Amino acid sequence: MANFLKKMIENDKKELRRLEKIADKIDAHASAMEQLSDEQLREKTDEFKARYQKGETLDELLPEAFAVVREAAKRVLGLFPYRVQLMGGIVLHDGNIPEMRTGEGKTLTATMPVYLNALSGEGVHVVTVNEYLATRDSNEMGELYNFLGLSVGLNINSKSSDEKREAYNCDITYSTNNELGFDYLRDNMVVYRSQMVQRPLNYAIVDEVDSILIDEARTPLIISGQAEKSTALYTRADNFVKRLKEDEDYKIDIQSKTIGLTEAGIEKAEQTFGLDNLYDIENTALTHHLDQALRANYIMLLDIDYVVQDNKVLIVDQFTGRIMDGRRYSDGLHQAIEAKEGVEIEDETKTMATITFQNYFRMYKKLAGMTGTAKTEEEEFREIYNIQVIQIPTNRPIIRDDRPDLLYPTLESKFNAVVEDIKERYHKGQPVLVGTVAVETSELLSDKLNAAKIPHEVLNAKNHFKEAEIIMNAGQKGAVTIATNMAGRGTDIKLGLGVLELGGLAVIGTERHESRRIDNQLRGRAGRQGDPGVSQFYLSLEDDLMKRFGSERIKTFLERMNVQEEDAVIQSKMFTRQVESAQKRVEGNNYDTRKNVLQYDDVMREQREVIYAQRQEVIMEENDLSDVLMGMVKRTIGRVVDSHTQLEKEEWNLDGIVDFAASTLVHEDTISKKDLENKSAEEIKDYLVARAQEVFEEKSQQLNGQEQLLEFEKVVILRVVDTKWTDHIDAMDQLRQSVGLRAYGQNNPLVEYQTEGYSMYNNMVGSIEYEVTRLFMKSEIRQNVQREQVAQGQAEHPETEQDAAAQSNTSAKRQPVRVDKKVGRNDLCPCGSGKKFKNCHGRNA
């Protein structure tokens, strides 16, 4: 381990030496750039583009291009990037992460690699965590890029499709991570090429990269449509679980945040709902509603996981503390919370398209990111995204005083001490930023400060719209600001007059977060660019982290020291090590979970990429899809004939082939059993393909010209692909939940998921080709046929990381079962074989 760390440190030093050399080359161009007029400086952009087109690489253009941006920034913004910012810019261009401390000017650092990579004409995306930052940076930095002759676009939720398309076609596009992901999904749901907005994904710089690629990595973006399910069952399930008692009727595992009924709870459910067996197949819907009602009532907490405003349940982002407008928990959890809170229950939704940030951002040709806290997650960035983390030195030494943690026995004694500390600093005039992990805590502390007559501002999910204004004033003399995790990331807290003499900004943490990174972000609000500052964390044995991990040893330690007073306080290196050890364990668990989820997600990623690529080929086709369509017809015929001719020739099911031909390929009674006798299997295939070709030609002639034929082909293919794909997403989701239970049978759930997922995908492809064949060959031709989306979807927020963990560990004794409508004996088998049900899967029914 020691050798590994030594090697890493040596590599960092070597990389810094390389960056210094390139920075020297940039510096060498400074005086020449200073001599140029504004017009000459602007003309450099066209010169660079021409040199790039002639074969010069971006790496070769870098020193001069960075020098141009540096000089332009001085003239337009009044800012001249320091050497450390040049080094950070080089790291970003290389597709890595420069770890730069708060206040070191990451926004300005990004302008140089953004400009350089925009010269290729393939587009650069600058990604921020919220629309405020995207709008601010596109306006402020846009002046610089416009001065240099580059176009800048802003992509936010309120933009129309035309405005989004225009923004994506700019040289540089500012956007939020959510909007990029949703636009990608929407582009793969449209039915006309003209409706697409994105270009191929080229180069992205992700601001606050740890927040997006680590904290939100497992968060899937979901486009959903309405599913037809009754909301009454949510109310019944909610009424039932509210009467249950913990430990007697249900049990909660605090560490994994899972919940399940006990035997007594199951018996109560069976009595209440009049059932013999709660986990019978017919009761799948009820068990699902009960599971979600349990989680809604006893796992999901008001003012922590969500808030209720204007009679609506609104999700609170666990990592930023912001309300996530327009987002809903999926899989019925949101409806269960609505039932719990007594607000109107909205219709349940069905997933139509989904992708995680991990898989979206891995599609870029080159990916880079910026943050002040990435080194603790360096392994994850390297393993999953193939990105290195390089620590960039600060422009000035950090003189902030980071004090050891203070431990109190109870929450009450801890908060009393916090209020006393704030009161003392307030009367002195020193500005204070207090970090809390939840809305609930910020409001509790606010009440205590009101009682102590200390004026203050509260920044949490309930008033996030005032964020910029609150943070702007947080460094003024006598300011007291309480903030949840977001703490105004991306917005600098600038110190007011006279604050330096008072010791700078004081940061107080009211408890440790699960991640050391989030704690470091809070500390980093103070002491920017060599300013003085102080940080202090207050902890109690009743904090969530302490209850979940390692508090027993600390309790023993307190007993040994005979600490009994309510307001006793401890500062100890042993205690600090315990806390950091607990945090490392949580970080390790979370990383393992994210890695595991990614392995599952990769199965869907491969399938999604194939489907989306084929879908795009159909939409982009401008001449003819007849070969594609006839290819589907031939493969469908091949599959059906093979399935009916597997046995000895005397036992071939020729009746089944005739049934298939009549229902799917040709007019009824045009092919008989006699036509197929005395032919080999290959000859039967050729015969059916020839007859299908005749019908195909006949259909083609019914349409007025090649253009209408192409349009009809697109309508048929897109409609079938979209319907089958959304069903497949649901089926894969159910498979994923069910394979988790197979671990009990000594089977590897991931291998089972990969194997069955591959089989289900092949079945879906066969089903698509069968349905396209049937629809094209048997449908009535209409002249005015138009493409339509299968359903109109809306963006939906999935459950958070903790919820996902809980879902994957559900302790109920059932597997999701897909119940289809009843099939008649003489109907075609729904498997797509073309046989009658009685001759196929219904043979043993």
From Swiss-Prot:
Cofactor remark: May bind 1 zinc ion per subunit.
Q: Which cofactor does it need?
A: Zn(2+)
Mainly localized where? membrane
Keywords in alphabetical order, please.
ATP-binding, Cell membrane, Cytoplasm, Membrane, Metal-binding, Nucleotide-binding, Protein transport, Translocase, Translocation, Transport, Zinc
List, as start-end ranges, the regions of compositional bias called Basic residues: 835-845
Subunit structure, as described in the record: Monomer and homodimer. Part of the essential Sec protein translocation apparatus which comprises SecA, SecYEG and auxiliary proteins SecDF. Other proteins may also be involved.
Q: What is this protein called?
A: Protein translocase subunit SecA
Source organism phylogeny:
Bacteria, Bacillati, Bacillota, Bacilli, Lactobacillales
